[in-house]
Amino acid sequence: MESLDEIQWKSPEFIQERGLNTNNVLEYFSLSPFYDRTSNNQVLMMQFQYQQIQIPPGVSFHQYFQSRLSEMTGIEFVIAYTKEPDFWIIRKQKRQDPQNTVTLQDYYIIGANVYQAPRIYDVLSSRLLASVLSIKNSTDLLNDMTSYHISDGGHSYINSIHGSSSKPSQSSAVSKPSSTNTGTNATTTPITLTTPSGATVPSTVSNGISTSTEIASGVFDTLLNDVVMNDDHLYIDEIPLYGEGSTLERLGLKGNKDAGLSL
């Protein structure tokens, strides 16, 4: 069975034949599925059909009808609010005595359509659920907009909504070596290594920037021993780069001070 709070009901035939006003709105409501046929309203309507009633002068039918309902106890439907020509609120309540009632449900009529008013619990539940879903979607969006890279030193944010992306790690990784190479080019002096006859010294030279030479480990050991065991306590900073007793001579390399080193 369909829930009553999801139903919209109307009767075009009744509206076309009799119209809709405050005097007959309860009768119109009694045709809807929201109406309780065991209510006091149904009892009075059955009595009015078979009994002749006299309405006091200056009293409308719905006022007289509701005054009769106040004399009874049980379930009843009354007009709680009126805003003619197209809005009424019908209230279902349980009357305990002429002065005390307990509200059970409200219904409202807009134009010719009858609706069941939602409960406060349902309204709050719906609003809270919508709020939680919105917060969840926002959190997911924030998670999609951030990424963590060790090279960046933390989180970076990307505006994925507009499809733009930034790669600071790559740009910085490219720019830093270029600046380092620039400084190296400005201060490095090209060196050409010279290998003495009978010696084999593999080397790799790239554009005059960096030089890597493989020399037998025994040569370095000899040089280190000469420095450490020297009776004059000479430090390595005092050994000349070129000439007699120089580092190049101890390594078994020949060099020209003006032109550099050569194999």
From Swiss-Prot:
GO terms for cellular component: core mediator complex; mediator complex. GO terms for molecular function: transcription coactivator activity. It is found in: Nucleus. The keyword Iron does not apply. It comes from the Eukaryota. InterPro entries: Mediator_Med6, Mediator_Med6_fun, Mediator_Med6_sf. One of its GO terms (biological process) is regulation of transcription by RNA polymerase II. Disulfide bonds: none annotated. Pfam families: Med6 (PF04934). Keywords: Activator, Nucleus, Transcription, Transcription regulation. Transmembrane segments: none annotated. Residues 164-200 have a biased composition (Low complexity). Coiled coil: none annotated. Residues 159-205 are annotated as: Disordered. Belongs to the Mediator complex subunit 6 family. Component of the Mediator complex. Component of the Mediator complex, a coactivator involved in the regulated transcription of nearly all RNA polymerase II-dependent genes. Mediator functions as a bridge to convey information from gene-specific regulatory proteins to the basal RNA polymerase II transcription machinery. Mediator is recruited to promoters by direct interactions with regulatory proteins and serves as a scaffold for the assembly of a functional preinitiation complex with RNA polymerase II and the general transcription factors. This is Mediator of RNA polymerase II transcription subunit 6. It comes from Candida albicans (strain SC5314 / ATCC MYA-2876).
